[in-house]
């Protein structure tokens, strides 16, 4: 990784920590989640059409529910991280503060967690 990419990644990690802290999320949990989702690549596209740092599906962004506002631009690191943090917090709150279920719902959807279903695309 070049020095420029390394610096950009560290800047994005710091931004993720700040956004998480402002929402009362564990900053390291959020950083680990974003690292797992995209490796802090704001241009990452997932196989199912997920976009950006938090690997958000456009359909989730269009109608997130749970009082979460849609992001303007999922490729914009700030917009994506803010949406991702808000959505993660909403999922955690939806499951009564249960971090494990909240993170699972972030990845698979609240309905799938309620049904105990883990989609094949998220099993690895």
Locate each region found by the language model.
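Export/targeting segments at the very N-terminus of extracytoplasmic proteins
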Residues: 1-40, 78-79, 85
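Cell-wall glycan
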Residues: 13, 54-55, 60, 110, ...
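Short glycine/serine/threonine/alanine-rich loop segments
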Residues: 25, 66, 97
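Secretory-pathway/luminal and periplasmic proteins that interact with or process carbohydrate-rich
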Residues: 38-45, 63, 91, 110-119
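Substrate-binding/active-site groove segments that recognize
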Residues: 47-68, 83-87, 104
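A short, structured beta-strand-centered segment in the mid-to-C-terminal lobe
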Residues: 69-80
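Catalytic and substrate-binding regions of cell-wall glycan-acting enzymes that process beta-1,4-linked
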Residues: 93, 97-124
């Amino acid at each position: 990784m070049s020095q420029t990419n390394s610096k950009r990644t560290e800047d994005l990690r710091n931004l993720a920590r700040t956004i998480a802290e402002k929402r009362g999320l564990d900053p390291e949990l959020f950083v680990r989640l974003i690292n797992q989702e995209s490796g802090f690549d704001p241009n990452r596209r997932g196989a199912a059409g997920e976009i950006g740092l938090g690997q958000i599906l456009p359909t989730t962004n269009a109608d997130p529910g749970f009082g979460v506002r849609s992001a303007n631009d999922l490729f914009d690191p700030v917009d994506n991280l803010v949406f991702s943090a808000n959505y993660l917090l909403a999922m955690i709150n939806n499951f009564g503060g249960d971090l494990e279920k909240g993170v699972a719902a972030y990845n698979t959807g609240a309905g799938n967690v309620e049904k105990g279903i883990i989609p094949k695309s998220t099993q690895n």
